[in-house]
């Protein structure tokens, strides 16, 4: 999949789930299932409920997202 096919949005983590998965509430009100990107796993970046994150959504499945950045 090409990089320009993704949709980037801002959101807030509302719940931790098993296997590095999180429930994220987007700024438009939708709730999606998000998993941590590979680079964030490699650098041991911790994500807690309440953190503001940037997620990437694919146009094919808008209910799942990849967490690519955690704001301070």
Swiss-Prot record:
GO molecular function: ribosome binding; rRNA binding; translation initiation factor activity
Taxonomy, superkingdom: Bacteria
Major subcellular site: cytoplasm
Occurrences of domain S1-like (ranges): 1-72
PROSITE patterns documented for this protein: S1_IF1_TYPE
Record-linked Gene3D superfamilies: Nucleic acid-binding proteins
InterPro entries given in the database record: NA-bd_OB-fold, RNA-binding_domain_S1_IF1, S1_domain, TIF_IF1
Keywords tagged on the record: Cytoplasm, Initiation factor, Protein biosynthesis, RNA-binding, rRNA-binding
GO cellular component, one term: cytosol
Pfam families according to UniProt: eIF-1a
Keyword Metal-binding: no
Compartments in which it is found: Cytoplasm
Family: Belongs to the IF-1 family.
Function description: One of the essential components for the initiation of protein synthesis. Stabilizes the binding of IF-2 and IF-3 on the 30S subunit to which N-formylmethionyl-tRNA(fMet) subsequently binds. Helps modulate mRNA selection, yielding the 30S pre-initiation complex (PIC). Upon addition of the 50S ribosomal subunit IF-1, IF-2 and IF-3 are released leaving the mature 70S translation initiation complex.
Record-linked HAMAP family: IF_1
Subunit structure: Component of the 30S ribosomal translation pre-initiation complex which assembles on the 30S ribosome in the order IF-2 and IF-3, IF-1 and N-formylmethionyl-tRNA(fMet); mRNA recruitment can occur at any time during PIC assembly.
Name used for this protein in its record: Translation initiation factor IF-1
Organism: Burkholderia thailandensis (strain ATCC 700388 / DSM 13276 / CCUG 48851 / CIP 106301 / E264)
Lineage summary: Bacteria, Pseudomonadati, Pseudomonadota, Betaproteobacteria, Burkholderiales
Underlying gene: infA
């Amino acid at each position: 999949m090409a990089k320009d096919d993704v949709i980037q949005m801002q959101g807030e983590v509302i719940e931790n789930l098993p296997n590095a998965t999180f429930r994220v509430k987007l700024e438009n009100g939708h709730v999606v299932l998000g998993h941590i990107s590979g680079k964030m796993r490699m650098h041991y970046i911790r994500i807690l409920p309440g953190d503001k994150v940037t997620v990437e959504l694919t146009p094919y499945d808008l209910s799942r997202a990849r967490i690519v950045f955690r704001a301070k």
